[in-house]
Amino acid sequence: MRSTSITIHPNALMHNLQIIKSQLNPTTKVLAMVKADAYGHGIDATVPALIHADGFGVACLSEAMAVKQVLDGMNVKKPIVLIEGAFSLDEWKVAIDHDFGCLIHHEEQLTWALAHQPKQDQFCHTIWLKYNTGMSRLGFNDDHIITAAKSLTDAGYRLILTSHFACADDKSHPLNARQISKFDQALACIRVFAPDTLGSLCNSAGIFNFKDQHHNWVRAGIALYGSNPIADQSAKALNLMPAMTLSAQVMAIHTLAAGDSIGYSALWAAQKPHQIAVVSIGYGDGYPRVVMGAKVSVTDTSGNRHLCDIIGRVAMDMFMIDIHGLDIAINTPVVLWGDSPTIDEVAMCAGTISYELMCRLTTRPKRCIMDTYLPKKEFK
């Protein structure tokens, strides 16, 4: 059986949540972002592991329903927030029926909220009001944010003023200071007529880089999954653990003669007799086709781990690695990303970010859950 697999580590998710909480004041709550099927990790595996988060954030109604189904199966009730809000009046009404919190970022959503209100004791009676402080993606601009807030509070709603850092991964970027200043000013203005208004500004990068801006809620995303949220420190330096291991196996081994080429377009050729292995994964599984300088982890017959170069072109179902001088057997497991190499390292080689690699994995690899990592071996 082809053994390409995605292994999710719930213990790593739980550990990362604790690391995030250790950065916060005790009163600051964590909204665990589980949109896009929990960044490719799977709602069913992720939500139970993150059950000690204060709530869950999703992008759309179908994701909210999936999270609710898992929570219902655990007999647990937690806030679920639609961070893009309702996409129609009908969705707004469904959100009220299921008590999903909603973000409001444009006038039409505001109109729905004013015309169709939930009960005062529902969680969804607290609106996550989005303020565009500089990302220019979603949210009310400077000239509308206060009037939108006033309309909602006059109607009896509670508010969480929300914005999103554009450059929090780069602590020195000048836009950060401008966004913080705008957010603080708007929050102060709103609290004049609605003193109980809460604030939520920080994503994963903001949690680590702007500890004085945590306010009442943080929205933790990529850090929960063990990937690096900031530019100047690795995930390991932040004590984050990878929550996903992508693995395959050695499916063939060949000894090339000098001058033999491999793969499509013959991009790599042996300069002398050379041993290579074929690995059972490709872009049909979601592994990136272009990975300049990427390595994989392979264990030799003595149990020692080695980082081996990918050579030639990644195809739909397989690619080749350089194992010259190593004693490697067919069916040996190959780690594409996990503890080493990390997904951040692979993303850099692919010219993208870890988020995309997590989310682009296809349904072909089998999925499994493992509470602990395999015993670690030192690299040779």
Stretch-by-stretch model annotation:
Residues R2-P10, M14, E63-M65, A86-L89, ...:
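Active-site anion/phosphate-binding pocket segments in diverse small-molecule metabolic enzymes
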Residues S5-T7, M14-H15, T28-S200, H214:
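Active-site-proximal beta-alpha core segment in soluble small-molecule metabolic enzymes
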Residues Q23-N25:
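Terminal domain-start leader segments
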